[in-house]
Amino acid sequence: MPFFAYSTNYLINLQARIIVDVEATPANRTHEVESTRTMIDRVERRHDLKPRRLAGDTAYGSAAMLAWMIQEKEIAPHVPVWDKTARKDNTLSSSEFKWDELANEYRCPTGHALRSDRRKFRNPRSRVTKADTIIYRASQFDCEGCSMKDRCCPNTPFRKIARSIHEAARDETRRIAKTPEYNRSCRERKKVEMLFAHLKRILKLDRLRLRGPSGAHDEFLMAATAQNLRRMAKRLMLGSQQMNQAVA
């Protein structure tokens, strides 16, 4: 039996806990991440607002997404880097190789170079793969006599590392992850999760009444409006009570 599901995606102001924009998408990671670009562009176009930082989970930590935030939008990504380079077989991960920006090469723990231009082509090539990576290869001669071969590339003649063309953005995100501001963003992310919990438990929006993407968007937009009004009413009541106490 076919099953159709939609997800609501919020762009919120973490300080005020106000929902700034809403986007309905099919319930899969690719569409949900893409909705973030849509909402950020739409809010900037309509209201001339652009976030200084964006907090999210690992789904938003892909190389292309990080490059878009840092290089195109100048937004600090407070998200974990989506990194699959760590190895689980006790062999050396790519993070244990030192990157030399000037030489455009990696250096292994024993000091040998991994370069992207070892294979010579008659016609110049960009060397960028379909996965938006560049392959850096060690010399087979260096690897054959290396004392660390069993820990580095036991099943291949030489070591290879795939480096993303957006690796600079990934490195910048890793640097941000070590800052106090990043830790604060991780704590504040629960504000978003609370809105989703309120959506299901209080507003009972666990089943949509309208059909199709347009219907889902309308229902999610109305629900977000109700949440914003509820939040604004609480703030107005709190401000009124504080004013009355001050007068008294």
What are these regions (language model features)?
Residues 1-248:
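Anion-binding and metal-coordination hotspots
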